[in-house]
């Protein structure tokens, strides 16, 4: 999947580890949204 930034990854600075995965729509079952950013198209999720 496409990596995305979770709040736990720290500020959005080039070189940071991106520990989330983009899910179109909303997170899959067993995953949780891992940041506060609101996007109607996708959520950044973590297992």
Swiss-Prot record:
Pfam families, alphabetized: Toxin_4
Family annotation (InterPro entries): Myo_ane_neurotoxin_sf (IPR023355)
Subcellular location(s) per record: Secreted; Nematocyst
Molecular function terms from GO: sodium channel regulator activity; toxin activity
Chief place where the protein resides: secreted
Transmembrane segments: none
Modification Hydroxyproline, positions: 3
GO cellular component terms given for this protein: extracellular region; nematocyst
Disulfide bonds: 4-44, 6-34, 27-45
Assigned keywords, A-Z: Disulfide bond, Hydroxylation, Ion channel impairing toxin, Nematocyst, Neurotoxin, Secreted, Toxin, Voltage-gated sodium channel impairing toxin
Family, as annotated: Belongs to the sea anemone sodium channel inhibitory toxin family. Type I subfamily.
Function (record text): Slows down the inactivation process of TTX-sensitive voltage-gated sodium channels (Nav). Has a strong crab-paralyzing activity. The minimum lethal dose against crabs is 7.9 mg/kg.
Protein's UniProt name: Delta-actitoxin-Cgg1a
């Amino acid at each position: 999947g496409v990596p995305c930034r979770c709040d736990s990854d720290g500020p959005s600075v080039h070189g940071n580890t991106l520990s989330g995965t983009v899910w179109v729509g909303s997170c899959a079952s067993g995953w949780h949204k891992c940041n506060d950013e609101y996007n109607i198209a996708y959520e950044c999720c973590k297992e």
